[in-house]
């Protein structure tokens, strides 16, 4: 059996309900998958939710519940209904709290530990709970307003925390040369070109080993390190593995071979380094192929800022689909925003395009077609005739497009 065309959305962090930025990514991946499917290819779309980590735990406690109940509620009431709301035809939905994922993560960890790619050490640094990531000084900016005088995360605009921990580390630094060679040998591995340039520049500066565990003395919402029950797995190391645990890693080699490596992994540019640096290094360490391509799309902006629930700039997809419908939602975000670049959303632009391009453009075409069928064929669409050479030539060109 030939390999299926495998597309993944990013594994979405489930500390809150989805906004249109998440839906934008889902639609883009769905459109790509459907395009390959209509060409007669077998295509597989994976999406899902990342449910571990300190941020989820803090959010749950802030809502007077436990993290499992909190994530169950969000997935059931918000994330799964989103797929139906915007007509996503995914073949699987994985949650990182599922046993199939947790067991496979521990297998992967044990494999890397046995191969001497993991060791125990100490680390001190600036930690952003929102990003679930240690930050370099260059990743921080001066705070404003209530955070004036403090250094804050450039993405979340909130102060980082100074942490000193003894954790387990993945030998990421050993993969610098292999990664650079992979980028050179596979020039379309990271797309668009601006994203590739950023990744290559980052790796050339030198890579530090990656802390991949957290002590249970801090918090315990995560997957146990298999050889040390006093530690849980770093949420990003856990989350990245969903792309293979969902398709049979450690349990169904035939399915894994059918789908992996992924053909396209679509991510937001703010998590590009995880997917274009850490993720391929993890796979190389395990003896697995990296994905064929990682595409980092731009941010969806509202009022010049990245879409964010915490900054009250998050717009629910239902706010749009309840008025304009799913088809208009999908059309607008694929037409109005250049994929790979930042794009601004406004209600005025959506309404204008809906009227000019859908109602007046496609709407008039449909109306005239129905009128002609009614006038010349008694309202019955005639059976198609045989394809002529010109028809076949047009179809051949379309298939190569």
Positions of the model-derived regions?
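Structured secondary-structure scaffolds
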Residues: 2-47, 95, 100-104, 155-375
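Hydrophobic faces of stable alpha-helices that mediate helix-helix packing
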Residues: 75-76, 176, 363-370, 391, ...
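A broadly conserved sequence feature marking short terminus-proximal activation segments
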Residues: 70-139
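Acidic, turn-prone loop/beta-hairpin segments
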Residues: 377-400
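Cys/His-rich short segments
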Residues: 115-176, 180
């Amino acid at each position: 059996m030939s390999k299926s065309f495998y597309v993944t959305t990013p594994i979405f962090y489930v500390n809150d309900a989805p906004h249109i930025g998440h839906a934008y990514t889902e639609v883009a991946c769905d459109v790509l998958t459907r395009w390959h499917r209509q060409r007669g290819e077998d295509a597989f779309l994976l999406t899902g939710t990342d449910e571990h980590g300190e941020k989820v735990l803090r959010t749950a406690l802030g809502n007077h519940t436990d993290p499992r109940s909190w994530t169950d509620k969000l997935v059931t009431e918000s994330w799964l209904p989103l797929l139906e709301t915007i007509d996503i035809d995914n073949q699987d939905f994985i949650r990182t709290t599922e046993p199939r994922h947790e067991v496979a993560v521990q297998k992967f960890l044990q494999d890397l530990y046995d191969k001497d790619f993991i060791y125990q050490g100490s680390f001190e640094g600036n930690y952003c709970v929102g990003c679930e990531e240690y930050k370099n000084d260059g990743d921080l900016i001066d705070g404003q307003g209530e955070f004036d005088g403090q250094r804050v995360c450039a993405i979340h605009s909130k102060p980082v925390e100074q942490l000193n921990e003894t954790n387990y580390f993945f030998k990421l630094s050993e993969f610098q040369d292999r990664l650079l060679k992979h980028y050179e040998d596979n020039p379309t591995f990271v797309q668009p070109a601006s994203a590739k340039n950023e990744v290559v520049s980052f790796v050339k500066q030198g890579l530090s080993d990656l802390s991949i565990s957290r002590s249970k003395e801090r918090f315990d919402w995560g997957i146990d390190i298999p050889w040390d029950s006093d530690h849980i797995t770093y949420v990003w190391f856990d989350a990245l593995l969903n792309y293979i645990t969902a398709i049979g890693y450690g349990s169904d080699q035939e399915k894994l071979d059918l789908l992996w490596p992924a053909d396209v992994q679509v991510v937001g540019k703010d998590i590009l380094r995880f997917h274009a640096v850490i993720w391929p290094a993890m796979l190389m360490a395990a003896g697995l192929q990296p994905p064929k391509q990682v595409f980092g799309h731009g941010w969806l902006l509202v009022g010049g800022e990245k879409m964010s629930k915490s900054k009250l700039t998050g717009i629910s997809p239902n706010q749009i689909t309840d008025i304009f419908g799913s088809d208009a939602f999908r059309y607008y975000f694929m037409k109005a925003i250049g994929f790979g670049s930042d794009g601004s959303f406004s209600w005025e632009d959506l309404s204008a395009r809906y009227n000019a391009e859908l109602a007046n453009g496609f709407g008039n075409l449909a109306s005239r077609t129905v009128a002609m069928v009614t006038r010349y064929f008694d309202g019955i669409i005639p059976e198609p005739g045989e394809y002529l050479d010109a028809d076949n030539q047009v179809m051949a060109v379309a298939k190569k497009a």
